[in-house]
A protein has these predicted regions:
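Internal glycine-rich alpha/beta core junctions
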Residues: 20-38, 100-208
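A helix-coil-helix interface module used to build multimeric assemblies
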Residues: 1-128, 145
């Protein structure tokens, strides 16, 4: 209940502290007494930070996957309606070969499929629990790391405690996956600008 109250009030109401973790602990103690200090048992800010990053990043990656799949479905639906709609294919901004709207749209659907795979791959490595690593060498408390991971929705553990506390490669991998997705979407957007200038498509005012 104390944590729910803190979330409802917003982090702007937290008391001063060395960092957000200490501030939250102080806020909990203010609400439930000294027993609130036990929430830090068997944990360090090192594995807490690592867990929070992974927990939040997992949400962002899953939202990205969902949005990318929805975009692919839209492209596939429009493509299905235009399998025989002829359009020019461009090279160097010049009409070069005839193709179909379906052929063109499916090229981006294929690229988005690879983008989705990259996000799934990244999520597999993101969604590992570092908790139990403590500062970097574990904790003397006999905790069940696998149970903690299960309760927080992680698929498994970062097995090595030093790696668990210090690893940030999953951030680079996820950033690269989103950057690649952005390149795909940028290409589609640029194409639509070119096609709208040539009069082949008309963009809604909300996007123009």
């Amino acid at each position: 209940d104390a944590l729910d109250d803190i979330e409802d009030e917003g982090h702007g109401t937290l008391p001063d502290g060395e960092d957000v973790h200490a501030a939250i602990e102080t806020a909990v103690i203010e609400r439930v007494g000294e027993r609130g200090g036990r929430m830090h048992t068997a944990r360090s800010r090192n594995d807490e930070v690592a867990a929070c990053i992974r927990y939040r990043l997992r949400e962002d990656v899953l939202e990205g996957i969902e949005a990318t799949i929805e975009a692919r479905e839209v492209l596939a639906d429009v493509a299905e309606a235009h399998t025989e709609t002829i359009m020019p294919g461009f090279t160097h901004l010049q009409p070069a070969q005839p193709t179909t709207v379906a052929h063109y749209l499916c090229s981006y659907a294929s690229a988005l499929a690879r983008d989705t795979e990259r996000l799934f791959d990244a999520c597999e490595r993101v969604n590992r629990s570092p908790l139990g690593a403590a500062a970097f060498a574990g904790t003397p408390f006999d905790i069940d790391r696998e149970r903690t991971a299960e309760l927080l929705g992680f698929d498994g553990l970062v097995e090595n405690s030093m790696d668990a506390a210090s690893a940030r490669d999953f951030l680079v991998e996820t950033t690269a996956a989103f950057a690649t997705l952005s390149t795909t979407l940028s290409g589609l957007a640029e194409d639509l600008v070119v096609y709208s200038n040539a009069g082949y498509v008309e963009l809604d005012d909300a996007y123009a």
